[in-house]
């Protein structure tokens, strides 16, 4: 058993004196930046989400996922795989675009209850909860941009993004269930084709970690993802999932630098994994055999969007990989939310913030895990470019500007499917 002391930083974002320009704001802003540089994520304490609202969103998810499959399948979107997803009843999710806007949520509930006016109570609960997650996201994004001296771009940046919400349900596989394998989850991830999932099945990776570019696979091959997979299989499956749009971030001396902040993940789903894991807040995370891998509700990955704000309620499951390749098992506590940086933030900040590898590993027998998350997504027709203020001799530019749609096409090309670190292959500056 490893150390029990590892845990994510806990930052209070609900302090009554936490106002922009105040000394408390500067203090918390510094803590947020350090947490994102060191871990790529942190636990946010935010008691502005009442316990009553937390219970309401849980009951809402239970009610939604209890609907017949044919009803849930009405949750559709013009983009494939953005709506309802189900894989062998091991996990399923529902998707809502701009869930902080009541009109959009009403459209969602009307899909499920088309012969009435939707479900007013469910719509209102989702809206209220989404609004609180958006509050956290906006506060953190403002702090990050201020901390790097690019606060003059904040307003344009905030206007350039939109939100996608996912309500998720995970069921722990029964002990000894030989029918549930990593291949099952890889197949699921391939079907999550529009949420930015990029699984690499059976790959053999052993990569180093950089101090400055800590976990951006596009910057440093395998940063934060030291996976030893001795399977002899080198056929990589790269599937991007676009719960994404594009975001316009005005950065860099009058240049309307464009950024892709799409929701997506870069997944390493390895058969016969030898994962050297570390202990976490309370428990060691051991994943040295196939039985442990069967518990994965979502294999190891990095998000591709800007930020994810996650609520996992009472049942744990989220695990985050540290710089030194140890796993932190994040234990839920009241009024806390997990803020996770994505690959797009790494690119936007020129590698100064890391996007952590993380996974979902459900271990509690016969207990269903419900989570809700807001993903900060880009609006259409923009590309990523780090602002000039973040590029200097010590921090040379790591990425060429790129349009998300072109990157997405590359992901699905024959060449893209053969490359593990697709973003790096597509747009990394060669001198970096």
UniProtKB/Swiss-Prot annotation:
Its EC number is 1.14.11.-. Fe cation binds at residues 301, 303, 358. SUPFAM superfamilies: Clavaminate synthase-like (SSF51197). Residues 281-378 form the Fe2OG dioxygenase domain. Its cofactor is Fe(2+). 2-oxoglutarate binds at residue 369. Belongs to the iron/ascorbate-dependent oxidoreductase family. 2-oxoglutarate-dependent dioxygenase involved in glucosinolates biosynthesis. Catalyzes the conversion of methylsulfinylalkyl glucosinolates to alkenyl glucosinolates. This is 2-oxoglutarate-dependent dioxygenase AOP2. It comes from Arabidopsis thaliana. The lineage of its organism: Eukaryota, Viridiplantae, Streptophyta, Embryophyta, Tracheophyta.
């Amino acid at each position: 058993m490893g150390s029990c002391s590892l845990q994510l930083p806990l930052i209070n974002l609900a302090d009554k004196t936490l106002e922009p320009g105040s000394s408390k704001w500067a203090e918390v802003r510094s803590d947020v930046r350090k947490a994102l540089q060191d871990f790529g994520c942190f636990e946010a304490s935010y008691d502005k989400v009442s316990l009553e609202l937390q219970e309401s969103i849980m009951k809402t998810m239970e009610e939604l996922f209890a609907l017949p499959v044919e009803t849930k399948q009405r949750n559709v979107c013009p983009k494939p795989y953005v709506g309802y997803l189900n894989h062998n009843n091991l996990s399923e999710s529902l998707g809502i675009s701009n869930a902080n806007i009541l009109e959009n949520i009403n459209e969602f509930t009307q899909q499920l209850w088309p012969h009435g006016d939707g479900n007013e109570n469910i719509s209102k609960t989702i809206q209220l909860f989404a609004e609180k997650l958006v509050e956290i996201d906006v506060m953190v994004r403002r702090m990050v941009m201020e901390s790097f001296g690019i606060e003059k771009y904040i307003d344009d940046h905030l206007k350039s993004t939109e939100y996608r919400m996912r309500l998720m349900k995970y069921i722990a596989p029964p002990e000894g269930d030989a029918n549930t394998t990593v291949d099952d989850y890889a197949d699921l991830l391939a079907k999550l084709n529009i949420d930015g999932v990029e699984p690499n099945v059976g790959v053999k990776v052993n990569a180093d970690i950089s101090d400055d570019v800590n976990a951006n696979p596009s910057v440093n091959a395998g940063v934060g993802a030291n996976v030893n997979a001795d399977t002899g299989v080198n056929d990589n499956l790269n599937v991007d999932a676009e719960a994404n749009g594009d975001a316009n971030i005005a950065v860099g001396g009058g240049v309307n630098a464009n950024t892709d902040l799409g929701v997506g993940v870069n997944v390493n789903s390895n058969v016969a994994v030898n994962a050297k894991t570390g202990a976490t807040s309370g428990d060691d995370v051991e994943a040295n055999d196939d039985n442990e891998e069967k518990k994965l509700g979502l294999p190891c990955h990095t998000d591709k969007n800007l930020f994810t704000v996650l609520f996992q309620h009472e049942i744990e499951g989220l695990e985050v990989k540290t710089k030194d390749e140890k796993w932190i098992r994040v234990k839920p506590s009241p009024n806390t939310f997990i803020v996770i940086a994505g690959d797009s933030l790494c690119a936007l900040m020129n590698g100064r913030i890391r996007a952590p590898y993380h996974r979902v590993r459900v271990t509690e027998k016969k207990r269903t895990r419900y989570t809700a998350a807001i993903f900060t997504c880009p609006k259409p027709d923009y590309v990523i470019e780090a602002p000039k203020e973040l590029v200097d001799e010590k921090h040379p530019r790591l990425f060429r500007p790129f349009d998300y749609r072109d990157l997405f096409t590359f992901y699905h090309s024959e060449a893209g499917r053969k490359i593990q670190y697709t973003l790096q292959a597509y747009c990394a500056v060669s001198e970096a």
